[in-house]
Every structure is written in structure tokens, then in C-alpha cells.
Amino acid sequence: MFRTMMKSKIHRATVTEANLKYVGSITIDEELLEVADILPNEKVQVVNNNNGARLETYVIPGKRGERTVCLNGAAARLVQVGDEVIIIAYGIFTDEAARTYEPKVIFVDEGNNPVKIAHEEIHGQQS
């Protein structure tokens, strides 16, 4: 049996751009991708905390250090600059691996700077 599990996420990132004219995807600062162990072209789910929208897309790396989080193409219709989003990457694990895998949860500040890395989520935890 295989299980689809949260592999990593960037928690409460701030949308810095929304580019309707781009062909698609989400652009994320290359450094944030490395910290979260998310690869270019990897499928992610984006959850908008401001309006509840959920979407799936793929990642393209943004310029290192600029802290860009930009929704491109049709996804740009689902966000506003300044919205708070959660970016989640999933992995497919064997049953055995799923029981021992520790995901990466990257907490960022309002400027999309990583401030904390956790390997679990606790109910009621705010950040």
C-alpha cells in the first residue's frame, strides 16, 4: 500500500505578486524552496487563508533572496497581493515509510523570511 502524505509546507506565506498574463504556476523564492525541500516543477497545493480558495499548480523558482510568492496565470484570479497562503507539497510513501517520515513545516514572517522549521503540527498551534 502507498499513502499520500504531506511532505513539506510553507506556512502563512504572503503573496507578493499575482501575474494573470503568465502561462501558469507559482513562483517561489529559490531559498524558500530549498529550505522546504520543494523542487522546481513539483506539484503543490496552495490554500488561501483570506478567501478559502484551494488550487493545485507547479512550482517555478524565483530569484534567491527576493522572497517572492507569485501566483501566475489563472491562479492569479484566486489571490490578492498581501493574501496569506499555505503552500503544501505531498509525497507518496510506502506504508512503512509513511509511519516514520517527518515532514518539514516552514513558518515564515510577513516578509516571507523563514523563522522556524518544525517536523510536526500540533492542534491549536498558531505559528
Curated annotation (Swiss-Prot):
| Pathway(s) the chain acts in | Cofactor biosynthesis; (R)-pantothenate biosynthesis; beta-alanine from L-aspartate: step 1/1
**Has keyword DNA repair?**
no
Q: Any idea of its EC number? A: 4.1.1.11
Q: Which residues carry this modification: Pyruvic acid (Ser)?
A: S25
Q: Which GO terms describe its molecular function?
A: aspartate 1-decarboxylase activity
What does the UniProt record tell us about how this protein is modified after translation?
Is synthesized initially as an inactive proenzyme, which is activated by self-cleavage at a specific serine bond to produce a beta-subunit with a hydroxyl group at its C-terminus and an alpha-subunit with a pyruvoyl group at its N-terminus.
Write down how the cofactor binds this protein.
Answer: Binds 1 pyruvoyl group covalently per subunit.
State the UniProt keywords alphabetically.
Autocatalytic cleavage, Cytoplasm, Decarboxylase, Lyase, Pantothenate biosynthesis, Pyruvate, Schiff base, Zymogen
Return one Gene Ontology term, BP aspect.
alanine biosynthetic process
InterPro entries listed in its UniProt record: Asp_de-COase-like_dom_sf, Asp_decarbox
Catalytic reaction annotation: L-aspartate + H(+) = beta-alanine + CO2
Mind telling me which GO cellular component terms the entry cites? cytosol
Query: Which positions carry the signal peptide feature in this UniProt record?
Result: none
Q: Which domain of life is it from?
A: Bacteria
UniProt entry tagged with the keyword Zinc? no
Cofactor field = pyruvate
**Residues annotated to bind substrate:** T57, G73, A74, A75
Catalytic residue positions: S25, Y58
Q: Where in the cell is it found?
A: Cytoplasm
Family recorded in the similarity comment? Belongs to the PanD family.
What is the documented function of this protein?
A: Catalyzes the pyruvoyl-dependent decarboxylation of aspartate to produce beta-alanine.
Query: PANTHER family of this UniProt entry?
Result: ASPARTATE 1-DECARBOXYLASE
| Assembly and interaction partners | Heterooctamer of four alpha and four beta subunits.
Record protein name field: Aspartate 1-decarboxylase
Source organism per entry reads Desulfitobacterium hafniense (strain Y51)
Please name the taxonomic classification of the source: Bacteria, Bacillati, Bacillota, Clostridia, Eubacteriales
Q: What gene name is listed for this protein?
A: panD
